């Protein structure tokens, strides 16, 4: 797999979370109208939408084409009290801790046949319930660390004195039910908190699940308006998706799916938007390796230097890195072949300090 990016899908029971997950993976997780139907966290692997890998495969005709992938983890329905072990709380909070980001599915549709665990439809309330549970779970781990660090600070331990204010500050906001990610934490402060693996430090993408009729103009839906305003207050990203449409699309052949979406006035599935938004939110980019054996997309964080990117392929390449030969996707597509690109002098030789750009095609020279 080209990436280990992992996104946890959370949401209250019966908001459309399992329906969305089914569409993502075509895995058919049991989406019954019952609060705790998703007992084990399902993991699904989905291709990152990027036409460039297939364009490159068209030039090289490789034996194998490997796009980038994202892992989605469907985490069972959280409810009020989950942080205290109610519903299916504790084991699921530990699953969320293992993810890079959280996709929080929020119900923005009316349907009297699908019960809501809290009674009526109120997306802002639902967002608050889940955020409160995640804050409470983090509060417990921060408090333990804070108490322990305070004792060490009192005993005159210099390092403890230096980091105690960080734990105090995070503890304060979590007590108020505010996620830690809303704090403007410096790199060194984040490094101190890293070992706690706080859930509320993870970036959140609100997936606003709308009715099929609303997907053309989701912002006209008052539920979407309320949820989007709340997301913006939290400096969080949001994306409107109709889980029902996504499930229908996932069951169609490619041609039929395009026609179905076109009838709805859409050019692509909402899932593509979801994945792209998650990529942008996490600052991720793709670079490529090409050849007759394989054309492959690799995912790294924006700002990654060439040796580190090479390490994605194999640790030996990072260890013995000599240089990278780089050409951009656009240049190679224009030239039509490596030979033509070489003739035009478009292949650049870059050293250890080179920062990989989105769409770079890289050939790494190394010696171990």
Task: Report residues per predicted region.
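Conserved G1/Walker A P-loop phosphate-binding module
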Residues: 1-112, 143-144
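Short Asp/Glu-rich motifs
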Residues: 39, 115, 250
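Amphipathic alpha-helical transducer elements in NTP-driven molecular machines
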Residues: 36, 50-53, 66-72, 86-100, ...
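C-terminal-of-GTPase-core extension/linker across diverse P-loop GTPases
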Residues: 1-10, 15, 21, 148-355, ...
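Conserved Switch II/interswitch segment of TRAFAC-class P-loop GTPases
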Residues: 44-49, 76-86, 97-158, 173-186, ...
